[in-house]
Regions:
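Metallo-beta-lactamase
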Residues: 42-44, 106, 130, 137-222, ...
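Conserved beta-strand hairpin/beta-sheet module of binuclear metal-dependent hydrolase folds
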Residues: 2-56, 152-168
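Residue-level marker for buried hydrophobic side chains located in beta-strands
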Residues: 36-38, 67, 90, 162-164, ...
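Active-site HxH/HxHxD metal-binding segment of metal-dependent hydrolases
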Residues: 44-47, 54-129
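Short, charged, surface-exposed secondary-structure boundary motifs
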Residues: 23-24, 100-103, 173-177
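Short Pro/Gly-enriched beta-strand edge/turn motifs at strand-loop
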Residues: 7-16, 110-112, 134-138
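C-terminal regulatory/interaction regions
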Residues: 229-231
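Short Gly/Pro-enriched turn/cap motifs at secondary-structure boundaries
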Residues: 18-19, 119-122, 142-144
Length: 231
C-alpha cells in the first residue's frame, strides 16, 4: 500500500484503493481547526484509514464530522465505525439519508461486504450550505446526477479553491440512482466553481485550474453526446 500524503495546505489523502483498501474511494481529511473527513471508504480499510491519520500526526479522537458525498458503499462503508468509535457527526443530503440509515440501495452486495446502518445527524436540504470551522469555511453544493442526493464539497484555503467533486466520472445510470440530464447541469455547476484543485472520488488529484476544467468538461462532453444520441 502507498502512503497517505498532503495535497495542499491542511488537506490530505488518507484513503484510496492504493492507500487504504482496494474497495475504497478516495478519502480526504481537512484540518479546518476541527478535523473533517470527506467520505469513509467501503469499511474494510477502516483500521488502515485510522493508521494513516496517525501517520500524518492526526488523532482520530479529534474528528469532528464526516461529510458524505453520496450513499454508495465505497463511500459510506466505514461511517458506522467512525461514529461509534469517535462520535463523529454525519452530514449528508436529505435525499441520501434514507439509504445511509437503512442500507437500501448502497450497493454493498457488489463488493461482498456487510453494511452497518448509520444515523445521519445533519440532513441537508436544498442546494447550498456553509459550515464554519475554526480555520476555514467548508461549503457544499447539491449536484444530483450520480445519485439524487449527491453533493460536492469545496473550500478556499491558502489562496486556492479546493473542490471535492467525488464521482465526477459517474456512472450516471438510472439503476444506480443516476440521471444523465441532471448530471449535465451539475457538471456545469462544478465547472462554474473555477476550482484550482480537484480531489476526485477515485481518480485522484487534478491541478491547476486548467486541468480541473478539462477533466470535468471531458465527462460533460461525453454525457451531452450520449443524451443527444438517444433522442
Amino acid at each position: 500500500m502507498k502512503q497517505p500524503f498532503c495535497i495542499w495546505q491542511d488537506i490530505y489523502v488518507v484513503g484510496s484503493a492504493e492507500i487504504s483498501h482496494p474497495y475504497d474511494c478516495c478519502v480526504y481529511l481537512v484540518d479546518a481547526g476541527e478535523l473533517v473527513l470527506i467520505d469513509t471508504g467501503a469499511g474494510e480499510g477502516f483500521n488502515r484509514l485510522v493508521g494513516n491519520m496517525l501517520t500524518l500526526g492526526f488523532a482520530p479522537e479529534k474528528l469532528d464530522s464526516v461529510i458524505v458525498t453520496h450513499a454508495h458503499i465505497d463511500h459510506i462503508g466505514a461511517l458506522s465505525r467512525f461514529k461509534r468509535e469517535y462520535g463523529v457527526k454525519v452530514i449528508a443530503h436529505e435525499l441520501e439519508a434514507r439509504a445511509i440509515e437503512s442500507g437500501d440501495g448502497v450497493g454493498a452486495e457488489f463488493y461482498g461486504v456487510d453494511y452497518q446502518k448509520c444515523s445521519v445527524d445533519m440532513k441537508l436540504e436544498g442546494t447550498e450550505h456553509d459550515f464554519h470551522f475554526d480555520k476555514y469555511d467548508i461549503k457544499t453544493i447539491h449536484i444530483p446526477g450520480h445519485t439524487q442526493g449527491s453533493i460536492a464539497v469545496y473550500a478556499d484555503i491558502a489562496g486556492g479553491r479546493v473542490l471535492f467533486g467525488q464521482d465526477i466520472h459517474g456512472p450516471y445510470e438510472v439503476g444506480w440512482g443516476g440521471n444523465p440530464g441532471q448530471a449535465v447541469v451539475s457538471l456545469q455547476k462544478l465547472i462554474d466553481l473555477k476550482a484550482d484543485i480537484l480531489c476526485e472520488g477515485h481518480f485522484g488529484i487534478y491541478q491547476p485550474s486548467s486541468e480541473v476544467r478539462q477533466y470535468i468538461e471531458g465527462y460533460l462532453y461525453q454525457l451531452e453526446h450520449k443524451i443527444a444520441g438517444e433522442r
